[in-house]
Amino acid sequence: MARYRHSRSRSRXRYRRRRRRRSRYRSRRRRYRGSRRSRSRRRGRRRGYSRRRYSRRRRRY
């Protein structure tokens, strides 16, 4: 556990440099209108996505 704590403090630093890049990414993401929606969509894809796709195909036929 102590080892993990040490690595965490080390990443902090690193996070500071990363923060600058993240702000730029955020501004670009803000341009997209459904950024929040895309996130939820990703979650749905992970949960039983194949099943939804199959049902859609069946409906089309």
Swiss-Prot record:
Quote the function comment for this protein. Answer: Protamines substitute for histones in the chromatin of sperm during the haploid phase of spermatogenesis. They compact sperm DNA into a highly condensed, stable and inactive complex.
Region annotated Disordered, chain positions: 1-61
* UniProt subcellular location: Nucleus; Chromosome
Q: Which GO terms describe its biological process?
A: cell differentiation; chromosome condensation; spermatogenesis
Name recorded for this polypeptide = Sperm protamine P1
Please tell me in which tissues this protein is expressed: Testis.
Q: Name one GO cellular component term.
A: nucleosome
* Family per similarity comment: Belongs to the protamine P1 family.
Origin organism is Potorous longipes (Long-footed potoroo)
The entry lists its GO molecular-function terms as: DNA binding
- For this UniProt record, give its keywords in alphabetical order, as a comma-separated list: Chromosome, Developmental protein, Differentiation, DNA condensation, DNA-binding, Nucleosome core, Nucleus, Spermatogenesis
